Amino acid sequence: MISTDSLARIALDLQLGISHQDRFHRLIQSVRSLLHSDASALLRYEGGQFIPLAIDGLMQDVLGRRFALADHPRMEAIARAGDVVRFPADSNLPDPYDGLIPDHDDFRVHACVGLPLFSDQTLIGALTIDGMNPTQFDGISDEELRLVGALAAAALSNALLLERLARQSSEPLAPSTQNGPGRAEMIGRSPAMDRLRHEINVVASSELNVLILGETGVGKELIAKAVHQGSPRASAPLVYLNCAALPESVAESELFGHVKGAFTGAIHNRAGKFELADKGTLFLDEIGELSLSLQAKLLRVLQYGDLQRIGDDTPLKVNVRILAATNRDLKQAVVEGQFRSDLYHRLSVFPIHAPALRERPDDIPLLAGYFCERCRVSLGLERLRIEPRALQLLGSYDWPGNVRELEHAIHRAAVLARAEQGSQAPALECHHFNLAAAGAPSSSRIPVEQVAQQMTAGMGLRTATDAFQLQLIEQTLAAQHGNWAATARALEMDGGNLHRLARRLGLKP
């Protein structure tokens, strides 16, 4: 039985919160205490999935997981119910929190209540309440649970309203980019990520060129997508070009296009990336790898807004916003004569620094949870969790390859754990991760020979080969400080072939 005084105290306590996040934490802590549950979570509904906003009694990595309705029947049941949902202990719908309650990782959740949250008859989120005792919530009526849900819905609705008002008063997004699975989502709640989001919001609605600076694997393309999606050009194309993967012989054609007969093999007219991005955005990744001759031609397009296809003297007008990215120190490249100073100043009107993962270690559990859920879906697993000690190991590592290295480390660990444990609900343990000791330099990682021995156990030939190639490329890339051209030379590979292999293995977009 829930007393009116208890509900009133929750309502008053919510008013004391300094921020939305603080209020959310107060809410679920109060709910857990009031209902004597083992775990509770407040989730936002967006784009066909539930996104955790605040948790209590669950593993920290849950905050990074995304629960798509199509992949989680229990979450779908909550979304479609329209009222209190009580799942019986013997429900055949898998609980997404199984194995994610600390100190109960070997047990399945027994009692589960889901409260869909509505605002103006529109689903905006859910409150989930879980317990290890099958009869844990039998003494609480549906009406009492509805009152708890109403408090949660009011808190969430107010937060979403203020968020919309803030967005509309500053940098309105194109309607098609407000939500949905295709939008760019950056995982993390650290101060470094807050600063990054602020910089994106400041520049997105302008027409300024943006130079995204950061190490390999920090997510520079994701930042470019977020800038594009937040701009007035959001409904127009975002065209991607990796400058490091361009052989000099075809680079000009890729950028500016060519006409039939312009050179041997030009059997038809072909539009370049600038034409394809007309009225939209062109993202030039690894801009520092462009040759000086191409830099001069790129500068002309930025200055005058026109270009010429190879073999055609007729100028073409284009209206393109440039987003460029690099892991190089372009200022130093200018000093050394490897990059044009006038082009640098054209591109760096608004520089954005993408933080390295070691600059935001508090985000590692969230990212680990996010990648775990993606791996679970891609591998067709019932559940996938990370042991607490393994999560601590991930948090203590310096991640020279940044977020991309973390993503692939988790994917490899999931493959290894599944093969080793022969289970549809594997747990990732410390020995599944090929990481150096905490704080050790990246060169002290496990030798490739040892990695190969570990990875081939229980794997098919294709899986083992891919895993070995992935690890070898990652280690070489880290040793070459993220320079793909140097990595290709170290591996004695053609640069284009390396980029194609990296894309197939998921190392590059």
Swiss-Prot record:
Chain positions recorded as ATP binding sites: 214-221, 277-286
DNA-binding region (UniProt annotation): 484-503
InterPro entries reported for this sequence: AAA+_ATPase, GAF, GAF-like_dom_sf, Homeodomain-like_sf, NorR, P-loop_NTPase, Sigma_54_int, Sigma_54_int_dom_ATP-bd_1
Name the record gives this protein: Anaerobic nitric oxide reductase transcription regulator NorR
HAMAP family cross-referenced by the UniProt entry: NorR
Positions of post-translational 4-aspartylphosphate modification: D56
Domain Sigma-54 factor interaction intervals: 186-415
Organism: Aeromonas salmonicida (strain A449)
PROSITE patterns xref list: SIGMA54_INTERACT_1, SIGMA54_INTERACT_2, SIGMA54_INTERACT_3, SIGMA54_INTERACT_4
Function noted in UniProt: Required for the expression of anaerobic nitric oxide (NO) reductase, acts as a transcriptional activator for at least the norVW operon. Activation also requires sigma-54.
Keywords of the record: ATP-binding, DNA-binding, Nucleotide-binding, Phosphoprotein, Transcription, Transcription regulation
Gene Ontology biological process terms, A to Z: phosphorelay signal transduction system
A Pfam family hit: GAF
GO molecular function: ATP binding; ATP hydrolysis activity; DNA binding; DNA-binding transcription factor activity
UniProt pathway: Nitrogen metabolism; nitric oxide reduction
